[in-house]
Curated annotation (Swiss-Prot):
Gene field: rsmG
Keywords: Cytoplasm, Methyltransferase, rRNA processing, S-adenosyl-L-methionine, Transferase
Class in the EC hierarchy, top level: transferase
The UniProt record lists the keyword tRNA processing: no
Transmembrane helix recorded as keyword: no
Leader sequence segment: none
Binding annotation for S-adenosyl-L-methionine: 72, 77, 142
Database matches in Pfam families: GidB
Any one Gene Ontology cellular component term annotated for this protein: cytosol
GO MF terms held by the record: rRNA (guanine-N7-)-methyltransferase activity
Protein's name in the database: Ribosomal RNA small subunit methyltransferase G
Superkingdom, natural source: Bacteria
EC numbers for this chain: 2.1.1.-
Organism of derivation: Frankia alni (strain DSM 45986 / CECT 9034 / ACN14a)
Length: 262
């Protein structure tokens, strides 16, 4: 386990005056992150491009002044790079595992983000987030769940008109083709794929962008609460059950700036 490589020019362009904080974050990923099992030891040499910059370029598609939640934040990816790249965006790092939350709290303090970023332990239903609690303008997620399930998890966490930004791999268009019908039924419209970071990184970041409909019908709303296909209701019950288990255990490619609607 060694230190990460020096920050590339793309990092200076992306993080600007916060480059030193991004360097500190990357160093923590390479040391404490590896020691605590949040980052694989083989990832150290590619932390900048594969993780930090890869996540930070989400800044290109986050609305100005957004109130965002990073769902299943893990090592702080993508939430912390997003916050570093966008000082105007407030970020909540939502993470169910206590040991990961401790790491995130240490990182937030070490990089000086206490006024912009907060750490919340739990899952959406039992963390005061959702239909009966706080809702966000943006929800970001990286490698959390298949798209159909992810859509069901994130929909009740967002305000009407809120945006889901799901980082996916090279098969994003195939995934979307399979999940398109379910996402529409859940209440996501429009849905498209955007590419972030072109010209900054060798492999740009592919993001599924979906907007929560602001004009759901009553019938659609009931589906979200458990009628019909019951995507939302079923997921809320599942995540609540998973949360209890968690506490017991541990405690295709458009050009830059363009999108492909589906």
């Amino acid at each position: 386990m060694g230190p990460p490589p020096a920050a590339p020019a793309a990092a200076a362009e992306l993080f600007g005056p916060r480059l030193a904080a991004a360097e500190r974050f990357t160093e923590l990923l390479a040391t404490a992150g590896v020691e605590r099992g949040l980052i694989g030891p083989r990832e150290t040499d590619r932390l900048w491009e594969r993780h930090v910059i890869n996540c930070g370029v989400l800044a290109e598609v986050v609305p100005e002044g957004a109130d965002a939640v990073d769902v299943g934040s893990g090592a702080g990816l993508p939430g912390i790079p997003l916050a570093l790249a966008r000082p105007d965006v407030r970020v909540v790092l939502l993470e169910p595992m206590e040991r990961r939350c401790r790491f995130l709290q240490e990182v937030v303090a070490a990089v000086g983000l206490e006024e912009q970023v907060s750490v919340l332990r739990g899952r959406a239903p039992d963390a005061g987030i959702g239909p009966e609690g706080r809702r966000f303008g943006v929800a970001v997620a990286r490698a959390v769940a298949p798209l159909e399930r992810l859509g069901a998890i994130l929909l009740p966490m967002l305000q009407p008109g809120g945006v889901m930004l799901a980082m996916r791999g090279s098969r994003i268009l195939e995934e979307l083709q399979d999940a398109r019908g379910s996402l529409g039924t859940q209440g996501w419209h429009p849905v498209d794929v955007v590419v972030c970071g072109e010209g900054r990184v060798d492999e740009p970041t592919r993001v599924l962008r979906a907007v929560r409909s602001s004009q759901l019908s009553r019938a659609e709303g009931r589906k979200g609460r458990g009628d019909g296909e019951r995507h939302d209701g079923r997921q809320v019950r599942r995540t609540a059950r998973d949360s209890r288990r968690s506490r017991e255990v541990d405690r295709d490619q458009p050009t830059r700036g363009q999108s492909r609607s589906t």
